[in-house]
């Protein structure tokens, strides 16, 4: 992992990341993780760079070894009511609030920080630079992928397990063929256009 200079003077530092800003379906899922410096985890990196099998294995290890971890989410209705950016910020606030130990400082992937009562810093490419953010990205990704597998069993014709709700050619074709589900984000352009043309 490239060198990242941690903020000085803070004992408990949480990393926060989100997954699922781009999909047309389901919640945006965020995670917050406080790692244990005495219980290191090998192989932490951006969840997108890991195989599904490796992500699953690491997610279990993170949950066992971390001092604290939590998920936060914003549902499709909230995404539609707020917009995806604001809904992501809300989900991040929820993940931090759900931690059983409150951190002294929060490092957040990307370039925006939600409103928090704790000092925080945004880190561009944080999921590759900061172990805590990598851990959060892995837990969030595994959690959301599992949700898509559940949705896939409910609606097999949409093939959610394959595309995870992202606007792939397959998903757009299935959407046009079978229509909009309650779990679809109505404010997202392909879904909105379909609803307008009904």
From Swiss-Prot:
UniProt keyword terms in alphabetical order: Cytoplasm, Endonuclease, Hydrolase, Manganese, Metal-binding, Nuclease
**Cellular component, GO, one term:** ribonuclease H2 complex
- What is this enzyme's catalytic activity, as reactions? Endonucleolytic cleavage to 5'-phosphomonoester
Q: What detail does the entry give on cofactor binding?
A: Manganese or magnesium. Binds 1 divalent metal ion per monomer in the absence of substrate. May bind a second metal ion after substrate binding.
Subcellular location as annotated: Cytoplasm
Necessary cofactors: Mn(2+); Mg(2+)
Q: Which InterPro entries does this UniProt record tie to the protein? A: RNase_HII (IPR022898), RNase_HII/HIII (IPR001352), RNase_HII/HIII_dom (IPR024567), RNaseH-like_sf (IPR012337), RNaseH_sf (IPR036397)
Class of enzymatic activity (EC top level): hydrolase
Where is this chain primarily localised? Answer: cytoplasm
Stated EC number for the protein is: 3.1.26.4
A Pfam match:
RNase_HII
* GO MF annotation list: manganese ion binding; RNA binding; RNA-DNA hybrid ribonuclease activity
Q: Where is the RNase H type-2 domain?
A: 11-198
Which residues of this UniProt protein bind a divalent metal cation? 17-18, 109
Query: Could you tell me which PROSITE patterns the record lists for this protein?
Result: RNASE_H_2
Q: Is Phosphoprotein among the key words of this record?
A: no
BP term (GO), one: DNA replication, removal of RNA primer
Q: Which NCBIfam families match?
A: PRK00015.1-1 (NF000594), PRK00015.1-3 (NF000595), PRK00015.1-4 (NF000596)
What HAMAP family does UniProt report for this protein, alphabetically?
RNase_HII_B
Q: What biological function has been recorded for the protein in this entry?
A: Endonuclease that specifically degrades the RNA of RNA-DNA hybrids.
Which family is this sequence assigned to? Belongs to the RNase HII family.
Q: What is this protein called?
A: Ribonuclease HII
Q: Which organism is it from?
A: Mannheimia succiniciproducens (strain KCTC 0769BP / MBEL55E)
């Amino acid at each position: 992992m490239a060198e990242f200079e941690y903020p000085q003077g803070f004992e408990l530092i949480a990393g926060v990341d989100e997954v699922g800003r781009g999909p047309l379906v389901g919640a945006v899922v965020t995670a917050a993780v406080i790692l244990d410096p005495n219980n290191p985890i090998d192989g932490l990196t951006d969840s997108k760079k890991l195989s599904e099998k490796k992500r699953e294995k690491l997610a279990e290890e993170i949950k066992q070894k971390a001092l604290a971890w939590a998920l936060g989410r914003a549902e499709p209705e909230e995404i539609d009511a707020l917009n995806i950016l604001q809904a992501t910020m809300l989900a991040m606030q929820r993940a931090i609030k759900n931690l059983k130990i409150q951190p002294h400082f929060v490092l957040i992937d990307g370039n925006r920080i939600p409103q928090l009562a704790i000092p925080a810093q945004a880190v561009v490419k944080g999921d590759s630079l900061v172990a805590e953010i990598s851990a959060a990205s892995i837990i969030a990704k595994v959690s959301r992928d599992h949700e898509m597998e559940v949705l896939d069993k409910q609606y097999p014709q949409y093939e959610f397990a394959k595309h995870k709700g992202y606007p792939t050619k397959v998903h757009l074709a299935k959407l046009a063929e079978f229509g909009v589900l309650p779990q679809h984000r109505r404010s997202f352009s392909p879904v909105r256009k379909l609803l307008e043309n009904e």
